[in-house]
Amino acid sequence: MKYLISTFQRILKILLPNDLKEFPKFSKKDIKRFQTWDNQLGWCNLPNNVKLDRSDRKFQYQKNPTGIAVISTDEKGSRKCSYPSEKSEISFYGDSYCMCRDVQDNETIPWYLGEMRGTRVSNYGVGNYGLDQALLRLIRDYQYERSEIVILSVVSITISRCCSVYRHYLEPGNFFAIKPRFKITENKNEIKLIRYPFQNKEEITNLKKFKNFFRSNDEHYQLWKKNKLNYYFHILPRKILKKFGISLTQNSTETLKYDLSFWQKQEVLFLEMMSQFQSFAEKNNFKPIFLLQHQKKSLEYLKNKSPNELEWTAVIDKPKKRFPKITFLDEAEIFNKYDNIDELYLRSHHSPKANLMISEFINKNL
C-alpha cells in the first residue's frame, strides 16, 4: 500500500509539479528559511554573514571538495572587499554578476579593482536583482556608505526582471522572489513605484490573497499561462522520452529573446531609471557609471550580431546623449572577440579571469 501511495505521489508530481501551480501553499517553517527577506526590496543580503554559494552546495558532501565558493558580507552588508577599513572610493550595486557568484571573496570585480586602486571598493550586488531593485537599494542605503563613484552593474536580461513583481511568472518555481517595480503611467509622462506588497514575511503563506496585485502589475503573467500549456505539450513528453534514454535538443534562445525584447518594449522605463540615477548622483555629488554585463548565453548571442542588431543598443544610445554625466560601459567590448568563451565562466557566472579583465576595463574608464 505504501508503495502504491508513493508511486501515485511521484506521478502526481510529474503531472502537476509545483512550478505549474500559481500559488502553492507554504508553511511557516518554509517562510522561516527565507532569511534574506526585506520589507522594501523583497530580499537583500544580510550583514556579517557567511554562506556557501547555492550553486556549489551539491559539492559540499564530496570527500575532497574543490572550487566551493564562500560568500562573506561585512557589517555594512557589502561582500568582503580589499582594504575593508578604508573609506569607500567606489561602490557597486546590482545583481549576482555584480556580486560575482561562483568565485571566492578575493576573486570578485570589486576586490580586484580595490587592489588596483589601493582603496575600498564595496560590493552591494544581490542575486536575482533587477536594475530597479539595485537603484532602489542605492537610493535607500547610499547614506550609510558614501563613495565618489557608484557603478550600477546588471546583466542584459535586467529589463524583463524590472517588469516583474512575482518572479514565478517569469522563472517558474521562484516563488519567494516578490519585489517592487517601477511602472510608467499611461500618459508616459512620469514613473511611479509599485511598492512591495507585504508588511511582514508571514503574509507569503497566503500568496493567493494578492492574486490581483500580481496579475495586474506583472508583465509576465501571460507568459506563465503559456508555459503551463507548454509543459504538457513539450516538456512532459521530453521528460517521458528521457526516461527511455531519448534526449531531444531544445531551442534555448527563445527564452533569451523574450527577455531581451523588453529593452524596446520598456525603453521609457529604462530612460526614467537613468534619469533617477543621474539626479541622485548630482544630489550626492558622485560619478555615476552604468555597466552592462552578460550571461554566457547573452555573450554567445551577441557574438553573431552587429551592435545595431542587439536589442539594447539603440535603447542605451538615447540616455548616453540625454544623460552625459553617466558613463555607459558594456563588458562585451572586451569579450566579443574573445575566442574561448568557456574560460570566462564558472558554472553560471564569470570566472576569476573574466572578473579580473572586467576590473581592468573599468579601471581604464574611470
Feature locations, PLM:
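Membrane/wall-proximal cationic-aromatic binding patches
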Residues: 4-112, 116, 227, 256, ...
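Structural beta-sheet core signal
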Residues: 92, 152, 290-292
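Loop/turn elements at helix/coil->beta-strand transitions in domains of secreted/extracellular proteins
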Residues: 118-120, 146-150, 282-288, 324-326
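Short, amphipathic alpha-helical "lid/cap" segments that border enzyme active or binding sites
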Residues: 131, 135, 267, 271, ...
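Catalytic His-Asp segment of secreted/periplasmic serine-dependent ester chemistry enzymes
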Residues: 297-366
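Serine-dependent acyl-ester chemistry module
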Residues: 3-12, 16, 157-317, 334-339
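Conserved SGNH/GDSL esterase-like catalytic core that processes O-acyl groups on lipids
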Residues: 99-186, 193
